[in-house]
Amino acid sequence: MSTEQTTKTPRVVIITGISGAGRRTAAHAVEDLGWYVVDNLPPAMLGALVDEIAANNIDRLAVVLDVRSRIMFDALGVAVNALDERGIDPAIVFLEASDETIVRRQESSRRPLPLQQGGHLLDAVALERRMLSDLRAEADLVIDTTSITARQLAQRIDHAFAEGIDEGLAFQVMSFGFKRGVPIDADLVFDVRFLPNPYWVPELRPKTGLSSDVASYVMAQAGATEFIDRVEQLLGGMAPGYLREGKKQVTVAVGCTGGKHRSTAISEELSTRLAARGHRTAVLHRDLGKE
């Protein structure tokens, strides 16, 4: 009788991005989901680590990589190609944030950026963006952490990985306020400012789109149901194409003026509709509570 033990092929996620964008916060979120997490691994060691993980029958591996030099970027490409040849398709998650956000976070931590070397902080940020532009273009998932909290980042990571990044197309529906800018990581953006604003209804003004009163008001407006019907059909029709192109997650942003009433209510309804179609969905209200 054979005593050979069957090993699992692990799912591999690579977490990288701009310094100060939240790589370690993302790693902690994944670790809380039961992933085996390794921080600051040189790219050249990725293959050996996967072998060790597989030998110990660990099926989910998340690796935080710091790729700021051409040599390390090339080494990552070699490592990823080697895994592809073995039937392991690692997912790359790239985190970024605005210059202002990174400066604020770095000043709060009182730690210089790795590329700063005594120079100006913004120059170091710009250099890092240029060095990582190719990697960002190849990422399976790009998350802009500028306007989201650590908790919201964890929720997005949870949505991407809790059910497995390779198990069909997932939709992230995000409400936002145009006055705070359009989410730069959105794949599709819809504007619901054509609907009457509950802000001008005194009894609804202090409430949010999560309130049944506000949601009922928004959905009762002319064009609201038709809008959601059409967006639902559009996304349902696009889903097979996204999957054929290898896209694992689509971020749909729905905006109103402040992100408190209309976009929140519409995002909740759209997320419910997509879930009823069998898609993995999550809803994030980026600007709720910031008014």
Curated annotation (Swiss-Prot):
- Annotated GTP binding sites: 66-69
Which organism was this protein described from? Cutibacterium acnes (strain DSM 16379 / KPA171202)
Protein name (database record): Nucleotide-binding protein PPA0813
Oxidoreductase found in the keyword field: no
Question: Got any disulfides in this one, which pairs?
Answer: none
Q: Report residues binding ATP.
A: 17-24
- InterPro entries (UniProt xref): P-loop_NTPase, RapZ-like, RapZ-like_N, RapZ_C
**Example GO molecular function term?**
GTP binding
Which keywords are on file for this protein? ATP-binding, GTP-binding, Nucleotide-binding
Q: Which domain of life is it from?
A: Bacteria
Protein family membership:
Belongs to the RapZ-like family.
The role this protein plays is: Displays ATPase and GTPase activities.
